[in-house]
Amino acid sequence: KDGYPMRSDGCTIACLFDNDFCNRKCVEQKGKSGYCYFWKQSCYCEGLPDDKVYDSATSKCRA
């Protein structure tokens, strides 16, 4: 599934321009690849497991 990966607290992973950082974070969570989506300032991944993708309806993020 494509989408924003989550940290352990349920929030998205912030970034500014670092595609390598985001790609690493996505692969660590068993995704295929990832990049920094500048407009949302968050990492975006392709091919993540369903339970690793941020969903505002079920998120536990309180940031």
Swiss-Prot record:
GO terms for molecular function: sodium channel inhibitor activity; toxin activity. Disulfide bonds join C11-C61, C15-C36, C22-C43, C26-C45. InterPro entries: LCN-type_CS_alpha_beta_dom (IPR044062), Scorpion_toxin-like (IPR003614), Scorpion_toxin-like_sf (IPR036574), Scorpion_toxinL (IPR018218), Scorpion_toxinL/defensin (IPR002061). Keywords: Disulfide bond, Ion channel impairing toxin, Neurotoxin, Secreted, Toxin. Residues 1-62 form the LCN-type CS-alpha/beta domain. GO terms for biological process: defense response. Pfam families: Toxin_3. GO terms for cellular component: extracellular region. It comes from the Eukaryota. Beta toxins bind sodium channels (Nav) and shift the voltage of activation towards more negative potentials thereby affecting sodium channel activation and promoting spontaneous and repetitive firing. Only when tested on grasshopper mouse channels, this toxin inhibits Nav1.8/SCN10A sodium currents in a concentration and voltage-dependent manner (IC(50)=680 nM). This toxin hyperpolarizes the voltage dependence of Nav1.8/SCN10A activation, as well as steady-state fast inactivation and slow inactivation. This is Beta-toxin NaTx36.
